[in-house]
């Protein structure tokens, strides 16, 4: 009588192997999704100095996002990461399409730091965000990861007396301090910014109108002017 044992063993191996493969595939997907470069395919750009809120979180915690020290050492980044990890991973992709230059009219007060993107609302929250110390005149450095170029940058600064620890940024508590012209496509752009006599803790709000299409980016950077 012919034995069927080898055939049964094959079925058992396949039945055991399939769940194992599914588990491994799921684990790989989760790991890749948590890598700091997971959003790099959506490459765009951001202000790297003074670092925007999302970029500062990624720069400080991207390689150690599971470190429990983040909760106590950098509570605003911790809250942002808990609310949506993608806020930190995709620091370069805070954009909206089709604003046709109407960014102020189409961005409500209190939503400037997130570019009115609900997924990034944690960036609007007032609190102890890490601040970059700058002089009253400093060089803003922008990293255009995809070399989109710029139609313009507009730089705003909160008014004297504004408290980043308790107030959201709105159009009524910022002033336009710098407007640039066009920049050809390149990865690194820098220009001078004067803080117009302000001192202490402030929020720098930057608007970038990319040249390659109707895309508008907005970010907040926390600064300490000395």
Regions found by a protein language model. Name each.
Residues 135-139, 188-190, 218:
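Intrinsic-disorder/low-complexity, polar/charged segments enriched in Ser/Thr/Lys/Arg/Asp/Glu/Gln
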Residues 167-194:
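Extracellular carbohydrate recognition and processing domains
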Residues 218-226:
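Extracytoplasmic/periplasmic copper-protein system
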Residues 37, 149-151, 198-202, 217:
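Short loop/turn segments at connectors of secondary-structure elements within structured domains
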Residues 158, 198-213:
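Internal, hydrophobic beta-strand segments that form the core of beta-sheet-rich folds
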Residues 44-148, 152-168:
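N-terminal "mature-chain" segments and other terminal, solvent-exposed stretches
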Residues 2-43:
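Secretory targeting and sorting signals
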Residues 161-162, 195-200, 226:
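A short, structured loop/turn motif at beta-sheet edges
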């Amino acid at each position: 009588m012919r034995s069927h044992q080898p055939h049964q063993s094959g079925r058992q191996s396949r039945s055991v192997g399939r769940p194992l493969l599914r588990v491994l595939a799921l684990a790989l997907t989760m790991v890749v999704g948590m890598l700091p470069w997971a959003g790099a395919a959506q490459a765009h750009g951001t202000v790297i100095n003074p670092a925007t809120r999302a970029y500062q979180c990624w720069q400080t915690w991207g390689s150690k996002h599971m470190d429990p020290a983040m909760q106590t050492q950098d509570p605003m980044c911790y809250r942002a990461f808990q609310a949506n990890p993608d806020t930190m991973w995709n620091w370069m992709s805070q954009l909206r399409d089709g604003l046709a230059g109407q960014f102020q009219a189409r961005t409500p007060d209190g939503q400037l730091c997130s570019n009115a993107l609900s997924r990034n609302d944690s960036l609007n929250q007032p609190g102890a965000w890490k601040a970059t110390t700058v002089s009253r005149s400093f060089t803003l450095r922008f990293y255009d990861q995809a070399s989109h170029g710029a139609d313009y940058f507009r730089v705003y600064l909160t008014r004297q007396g504004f408290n980043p620890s308790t107030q959201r940024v709105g159009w009524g508590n910022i002033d336009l301090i710098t407007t640039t012209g066009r920049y050809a496509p390149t990865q690194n752009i820098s220009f001078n910014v004067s803080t117009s006599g302000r001192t202490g803790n402030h929020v720098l709000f930057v608007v970038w109108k990319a040249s390659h299409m109707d895309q508008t980016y907005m970010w907040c950077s926390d600064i300490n002017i000395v």
